[in-house]
């Protein structure tokens, strides 16, 4: 298995970068993807809001943006951008640790990179991708 995970912490925030990389690898293993490369970048509100506006015409900070950069029958290649400050706000609202929320978001982004999609709106929480995301998060919490 040749999977490369790169974590870039643009704000120098106190996060367990090795756990974020482990979460990406777990998605690859569980989805039986043997080759790929994913770059995970943690960024602040201003930077991720600018990306959200540029690529999705939404002028607010978001929690995760993912881009799949590979073609069919090519090794998985993609970028996952995590909004650190938005993740912290969400963790506070949900009453969970920031670490747990960041793991959830990196799993979510990695699933998008390998090809998963979900509907918009409230129905997205009932789709296969979200169930898979939560199962992967649960399996990581046992390691």
Language model: regions and residue ranges:
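An acidic/histidine-cluster motif and surrounding catalytic segment
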Residues: 1-102, 111-143
